[in-house]
């Protein structure tokens, strides 16, 4: 019985890496006017969610951050949420 528990405890847990939702064919383009898309990448408090959580690639994360900042500047998105 204890051998089974030891084998289960030693078994490594490999989580499959998510793919970038903006890479590939037929995907949504990052646009500062697309508020519904941008709101999925903003936390409840209005902060930009990091790419390690959303699995967005580094290049697309920069585009996303710039689009969010541009939308905030134009008043389409709030800077902070109460």
Swiss-Prot record:
Q: Name one GO molecular function term.
A: small ribosomal subunit rRNA binding
Of which family is this protein a member? Belongs to the bacterial ribosomal protein bS18 family.
Matching entries from Pfam families are given as: Ribosomal_S18 (PF01084)
InterPro entries to which the protein is assigned, alphabetical? Ribosomal_bS18, Ribosomal_bS18_CS, Ribosomal_bS18_sf
Q: Gene Ontology cellular component? A: cytosolic small ribosomal subunit
- Gene name linked to the record: rpsR
Enumerate the Gene Ontology biological process terms.
translation
Query: Protein name, please?
Result: Small ribosomal subunit protein bS18
Task: Report the PANTHER family cross-referenced here.
Answer: 30S RIBOSOMAL PROTEIN S18 (PTHR13479), SMALL RIBOSOMAL SUBUNIT PROTEIN BS18M (PTHR13479:SF40)
Q: Would you indicate the residue range of the signal peptide?
A: none
Organism, by scientific name, is: Bartonella bacilliformis (strain ATCC 35685 / KC583 / Herrer 020/F12,63)
> Where on the tree of life does the source sit, at the highest rank?
Bacteria
Give the quaternary structure.
Part of the 30S ribosomal subunit. Forms a tight heterodimer with protein bS6.
List the residue ranges forming a coiled coil, or say none.
Answer: none
Its transmembrane ranges are: none
Protein role: Binds as a heterodimer with protein bS6 to the central domain of the 16S rRNA, where it helps stabilize the platform of the 30S subunit.
Keywords on this record? Ribonucleoprotein, Ribosomal protein, RNA-binding, rRNA-binding
